[in-house]
Design a protein with these regions (language model features):
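Short acidic N-proximal helix/loop "leader" segments that mark the beginning
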Residues: 1-18
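A conserved amphipathic terminal alpha-helix motif
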Residues: 1-3, 121-154
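Short beta-edge strand/loop motif at the mouth of beta-sheet-based domains
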Residues: 18, 25, 36-73, 83-85, ...
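Hydrophobic/aromatic beta-strand elements that line small-molecule binding cavities or substrate pockets
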Residues: 19-21, 74-79, 100-108
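Short glycine/serine/proline-enriched coil/turn segments at secondary-structure junctions
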Residues: 69, 94-98, 140
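Mid-chain, well-packed structural core segment of small domains
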Residues: 85-104
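Short, solvent-exposed aromatic-acidic interface loops
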Residues: 92-95, 118-124
Length: 154
């Protein structure tokens, strides 16, 4: 069966999310919190635990391990420069033909850290993902901020 998509423009095939997150924590603490939150402490919708494996080196995988050799590859680490950059490329949570790039750029700002987040994608982005992706990243990025700002135990 062949399905045509009349009237599909470039804007229907692209996705761009940009967010700035101001964190009251050092650059190093914020970067470590980012790796933790995107890895073992990741959460899905409604705050449910969804731990991920994040191999934080160039070419490292970022994936959800479901056990028994099952899982879902979200992407690969395209670039990492501790503690100022981590960049991913891959399908992320989308199980259809899409190329995504996710960037976290960190810089010192007023005694804290500024995270500049950017998710750009190209391909057959389903409408449900288009609607939910901004809020989803907002939740993840807020959890990164909360983790970085929490008091350190002695």
């Amino acid at each position: 069966m062949i399905v045509n998509a009349p009237g599909v423009g470039i804007e229907d095939l692209t996705l761009l999310i940009e967010q700035e997150i101001h964190v009251r924590a050092s650059l190093g603490d914020t970067f470590e919190a980012l790796l933790e939150q995107l890895g073992p402490y990741n959460e899905g919708g409604e705050g449910r635990s969804m731990p991920m494996v994040l191999e934080a080196w160039p070419g490292g995988r970022w994936y959800r391990d479901l056990g028994n050799e099952n899982g879902h590859l979200w992407g690969h680490v395209q670039a990492i420069k501790r503690p100022t950059l981590i960049e991913f490329c891959g399908p992320l949570f989308m199980s259809h033909p899409v190329a995504n790039n996710v960037q976290y750029r960190l810089s010192e700002e007023n005694g804290g850290t500024l995270i500049k987040f950017r998710h750009s994608g190209f391909g057959l982005v389903q409408e449900e993902h288009r609607r939910g992706v901004n809020a989803g990243w907002g939740n993840i990025n807020d959890k990164i901020r909360q983790r970085a700002e929490r008091p350190k135990s002695a």
